[in-house]
Amino acid sequence: MASDSPHDQPVAGVSEIRGALVVRLTGELDLYNAPVLRETLLECAARSPRRLVVDLTEVTFVDSTVLGALVEVRSKLGSRDGLVLAAPGLETRRALEVSGLDRFFEITETLEDALGG
């Protein structure tokens, strides 16, 4: 039986804004929902967007499985500027810093900044 809890549905939406593909994530991102997140991000990357923005505004937690999926997607895009992590909260930012990935990704304070506004 499928569950519709936010834990199981990490992707809140995908939209195109000002030429960028924006993937809005929500809740706790971990081993249990990483496959859905990974699949969605890889599908978006396959569309070769000018910029793929991962909106982390509503994310409360990320684990190493999710960080690995983000690294994989960025590698598929081939450019550090092609994938932007927007508006990570304190816990998410801390996970990126502790893992050293804050130097691997472009990270912006807000979604608007990620969109070049």
Show where each model-derived region lies:
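Intrinsically disordered, low-complexity segments enriched in polar/charged residues with Gly/Pro
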Residues: 1-2, 94
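STAS-typified acidic loop motif
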Residues: 2-39
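Amphipathic alpha-helical interaction surfaces in cytosolic regulatory modules
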Residues: 31-105
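Short acidic-hydrophobic, aromatic-tinged amphipathic segments that line or gate anion-handling sites
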Residues: 106-110
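Short alpha-helical segment
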Residues: 113-114
